Amino acid sequence: MNVAHHYDLTDDLYDLFLDPKRQYSCGYFKNKNDSLETAQNNKIKHIIKKLNIKPNQKVLDIGCGWGSLALDIAKSINCEVTGITLSENQFDYCVKKAKELNLENQVTFKLIDYRELNEKFDRIVSIGMFEHVGRKFYQNFFKKIEQMLDYEGISLIHTIGSVSPPRDPHPWITRYIFPGGYTPSLSEVIKPVEKAGLIVSDIEVLKLHYSHTLRHWKENCIKNKVEIIEMFDEKFFRMWEFYLAGCETAFKWGDQVVYQFQLTKNYTSTPATRDYIYQ
């Protein structure tokens, strides 16, 4: 299981380089000197604004990670949230966190594949999960989104992508870090979205945000080098540092970006302008 391969490393490792909410995805830097925690909280707020969630709506978070987005949605809006993951470590953590925050009646976490769901949702969000879907399954993924999304609903897909034409993933990343992972070109996403019957209502390209995020992660790893080596070994530390430094370079000097796709079924699901996102 490709997701579990990466995310079921000991949680103690992630605590050594991620922000306190364990957000393992690109932050949103309003200023390049923002702290990692500030940027990650900015990201959550930005996504919640784009989803434009109303009270009592049903929200699905596909690939919910350690639950930060699902829990923050529940804390800020009186709605019903479902978070799903394929990682047992993440699932256990999410359930425990929901209990600690007394949000069990509002947030449900499930250890399940999104393809097994047969419910309707008003809002569907996926952060950093699309990279694991695989090119040959893009059509199936977006068709499933279309089937689960209410006619007046809004979906937001946040994914790493490339500004270059389609190409095979880097073999080192595939072998050592993300087996089965792939970062798509824009052209590879739009076609299956259209075929699924969805409308691209908004696209935002986050350019240097991930390079700033990765810089913070790399610096945190270096700061905690002794603990990481004790947890694993010197070889693992060098591999992890190389992974973070290489990805930082790809986002700063290469062709990697983050795309945020807002998808709907009709033109009236979102406001006429983007002002609501920044109010």
Where are the regions that the model predicts?
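Conserved class I S-adenosyl-L-methionine
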Residues: P55-G63
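Conserved Class I S-adenosyl-L-methionine-dependent methyltransferase catalytic core
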Residues: M1-K50
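A short acidic, Gly/Pro-enriched loop at the edge of an enzyme's catalytic core
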Residues: R115-I124
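A short glycine-rich, Lys/Arg-flanked "PGG" loop and its adjoining helix->strand segment in the class I
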Residues: Q139-Y151
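Conserved beta-strand signature within the Rossmann-like core of class I S-adenosyl-L-methionine
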Residues: E152-I160
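Conserved SAM-binding loop of SAM-dependent methyltransferases across substrates and taxa
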Residues: W66-I77
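Conserved SAM-binding strand-loop segment of SAM-dependent methyltransferases
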Residues: L101-Y114
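Substrate-binding/catalytic lobe of Class I Rossmann-like enzymes that use SAM or dcSAM, i.e.
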Residues: I160-P271, Y278-Q279
